Regions:
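Long, low-complexity, Ser/Thr/Gly/Pro-rich intrinsically disordered segments that act as flexible linkers
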Residues: 96-101
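An amphipathic, aromatic/His-enriched active-site/gating alpha helix that lines ligand/cofactor pockets
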Residues: 24-38, 54-94
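Active-site-flanking beta-strand signature of metal-NTP-handling nucleotidyl enzymes
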Residues: 3-8
Length: 102
């Protein structure tokens, strides 16, 4: 089992709009079979205005398939709508992948 963590450093004051996008995306992703996503905002972190998403996958192949974003045409249209303006909210980011040992 693997833990996928995306860490996004938002532009000042842009965490809330990005969080709303990701809440909707998490709901859509669950419908598309991605499983449950956790969303976290910083109380105290490496940088201010941080949003972290986490989800678990059984193997990296599953993650690669999820990353291809395949779904119904309606779902894909909705995902595209949700991602519009994403880059206007984010300054920088990174992805961490961990193997769950216990």
């Amino acid at each position: 089992m693997y833990l996928i963590r995306d860490i996004m450093y938002c532009k000042p004051g842009k965490v809330r709009p990005l969080l709303e996008k990701f809440k909707a995306m998490a709901k859509l992703g669950e419908k598309m079979g991605w499983g449950k996503m956790r969303l976290m905002t910083d109380v105290s972190a490496e940088r201010f205005w941080t949003l972290v998403t986490e989800f678990e996958v059984p193997d990296l192949k599953t993650f690669e398939e999820m990353d291809q974003m395949q779904g119904t045409p309606e779902d894909m249209k909705e995902m595209e709508r949700l991602m519009t303006g994403y880059h206007d909210l984010v300054d920088d980011g990174k992805r961490e992948i961990y193997r769950l040992e216990l």
